[in-house]
Design a protein with these regions (language model features):
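Small-residue-enriched, tightly packed secondary-structure blocks
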Residues: 34-193
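Bacterial N-terminal signal peptides
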Residues: 15-29
Length: 193
């Protein structure tokens, strides 16, 4: 390298690319294998996520009864080192029965490092919202439909009378509902399972 042509801007960009490649090569990749989880594994994980949801969120069972469909994305993994990404697979259920499998993919850029897992439940409260999701080739939150994320404090309950949004989301981990979360830009795509 010629010292007279050294450009710190190029070096910074190269370091970002190197970090992104290292993240992918290091095995922090999101899919457990190139085919993803089997349908039975997804259903089992979705059942566990729903049990956790019912336990952590008061009024959740009553709220779910009013939904036309639920997209349950258990154990969505996020990893980041400057460039971040998120991936998970889940089940769309109507009337308590799985009618399809989907993945979630999103990315981010900025000062971030670490890894975490969370569950996401998206409730389609109207037939129109559910049909719009099901008929899309790749549904993007914030573009194809707005997801109203519910954040309630400990001990509070979901009030089915005050929530009027057609699409409602809950993001939680083992500690409970997560605040300051956005699904905007997350893309959901139907899987062939």
């Amino acid at each position: 390298m010629n010292l007279h042509s050294f450009n710190p801007t190029n070096r910074g960009i190269n370091l970002l690319w190197l970090a992104a490649i290292a993240l992918l090569v290091s095995g922090i990749g999101f899919a457990e294998n190139s085919y993803g989880a089997a349908a039975e594994e997804i259903d089992t994980s979705a059942n566990v996520a729903m049990k956790r949801f019912y336990k952590q969120v008061k009024g959740a069972k009553e709220f779910v009864r009013g939904a036309k469909g639920l997209l349950i994305m258990p154990n969505v993994k996020k990893a980041a080192f400057i460039i971040g990404g998120e991936y998970g697979e889940g089940a769309l259920r109507i009337g308590g029965k799985t009618v399809g499998y989907y993945n979630i993919v999103s990315g981010s850029f900025g000062l971030q490092i670490g890894a975490q897992a969370k569950d996401i439940i998206i409730a389609f409260m109207t037939r129109e919202a559910l049909d719009g999701f099901r008929s899309s080739q790749g549904w993007e939150a914030g573009v194809d439909g707005n997801v109203a994320l519910i954040t309630i404090g400990a001990g509070e309950r979901v009030d089915t009378r005050t929530i009027k949004d057609p699409i409602v989301g809950f993001v939680f981990d083992v500690k409970g509902l997560m605040a300051d979360i956005s699904l905007k830009g997350a893309k959901f795509t139907k899987l062939n399972k």
